[in-house]
Amino acid sequence: MAKKITKKQARKETAAAVENALEKYLSTTLSADEGKQAGDTSPLGTPYRRGSVTLRGKMVPRHSTTGKLISEEPGTDWRDADPWRTLRIQSEFVDGFDALAKLGPAVSIFGSARTEPTDPYYEHAMQIAGKLANKNIAVITGGGPGIMEAANRGAALAGGTSVGLSIELPFEETTNDWVNLGIEFRYFFVRKTMFVKYSSGAIFFPGGYGTLDEMFEVLVLAQTHKIGNMPIVLFGTEYWQDLVKWIKGPLLDQNMISESDIDLFTVTDSHEEAIRIATSGITSK
């Protein structure tokens, strides 16, 4: 039987994991600085994003925003106090609303940051995004590499609006080069608000914890009617089939969800079907 841990222990373990990831990022950045010769592009290493601020080299902080947010230890820096943090959160909402207010119809594309350009799903994401752009529909992603880069690339090459909603993480790269409208966030919940507020549909490609987190949050918002008509597409039947089997099996059999909840998403391998369903929330308005 698994040993139960307290909330305090869980917070400490999470904070430690964040700090370990940050240390790994810093060691990689600093080691990349060594051996740089005159004339190299830059000796400062990979940029670190903190909201709208870009930091490199020695200016990269040793503690992350997330680590401070979940810490129970009282902070000595007034910038870490809850009232100041509240203002910072408000400013992120204002920046996001201001940047996206006139975006127009849009579809969000989610997926793994680890997908390589040689992966077939990368090409699928590129093509679907390009086809959306050709319909004058903006494409919104998390702004990172992998599937996100592929979708931004497809939209940009088609001459469309390619949006990247990036997040401050100590172990991920900066916004990909195919974003033509980018916003940097510190807080996941602000970023997620922008996804659901400005998208009329969502397409989920294969991904890990981050993609699953985003997918289930959108499903819950649709299930509880917190958002309106939000068509949800899972692209890649081979990848999603076991998850769908679990949802239609134990979840439904044990009355954890309703029959109607199964209809909240569609699984497909077809570009045309994915686009038709994802944009049905736009065409029905």
Name each region found by the language model.
Residues A10-L165:
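Glycine-rich beta-alpha loop segments
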Residues T174-D177, L212, A222-M230, T237-K245, ...:
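Glycine-rich phosphate/nucleotide-binding loop
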Residues L100-K102, K131-A133, A155-A156, E173-D177, ...:
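Solvent-exposed alpha-helices and their adjacent loops that cap or buttress functional pockets
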Residues G146-F205:
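Acidic/glycine-enriched connector segments
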Residues L234-K285:
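C-terminal functional extensions of proteins
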Residues M1-Q9:
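Short Lys/Arg-rich cationic patches that frequently serve as NLS/NoLS or arginine-rich RNA/DNA-binding motifs
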Residues R114, L169, Y239:
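Short, glycine/serine-rich, charged loops/turns that create anion-binding
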Residues R186-E238, S280-K285:
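Active-site/ligand-binding-proximal alpha/beta "capping" segment
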